[in-house]
UniProtKB/Swiss-Prot annotation:
Pfam families assigned to the protein according to its UniProt record, in alphabetical order: DUF3461 (PF11944)
InterPro entries attached to this UniProt entry: UPF0325 (IPR020911)
Name of the featured protein: UPF0325 protein VS_2356
Family designation: Belongs to the UPF0325 family.
Domain of life where this protein originates: Bacteria
Organism for this UniProt entry: Vibrio atlanticus (strain LGP32) (Vibrio splendidus (strain Mel32))
């Protein structure tokens, strides 16, 4: 019923609660969150990285100049279509660019802090 999600190793798509999609450099990051199971402290999630497709587009003006643009990976669009059938997301209002940048910055801070803590734990093991 959901061949693209099955291809990602998701065999119980009805357990999917929500998903998020963000762009980092030349990759789209899809994170799928599952319903919290009884006895679990945190809900399980999985992350997938898709490279963005790069295309050369002719710039208008007739001077044979091309510009590289990136767009979402076709496989990712198929996965998102299946996720939307499962999660039935509500349409979101247009996001304020400043707020989006601040949100991305806060996320990056958390990721970096977590990685630093992980490396420090590894260093302590070496002592």
């Amino acid at each position: 019923m959901y061949p693209n999600l099955t291809g990602l190793g998701i065999h119980e798509p009805k357990q999917i609660e929500r998903y998020s999609l963000r762009q980092e450099a030349h990759k789209d990051i899809l994170k799928i969150y599952f319903r919290k199971q009884k006895g679990e402290l945190f809900a399980k999630s999985v992350k997938f990285k898709y490279p963005r497709q790069v295309k050369s587009v002719l710039v208008s003006g007739g001077n044979n100049q091309y510009k590289e643009v990136t767009e979402i990976n076709r496989n990712l669009t198929l996965v998102i279509d299946e996720l939307n059938k499962i999660t039935k997301p509500t349409p979101t209002a247009e996001v304020d660019l400043k707020q989006k940048i601040l949100t991305d910055l806060r996320h990056l801070e958390k990721v970096v802090s977590s990685k630093i803590a992980e490396i420090e734990v590894d260093l302590e093991k070496l002592k």
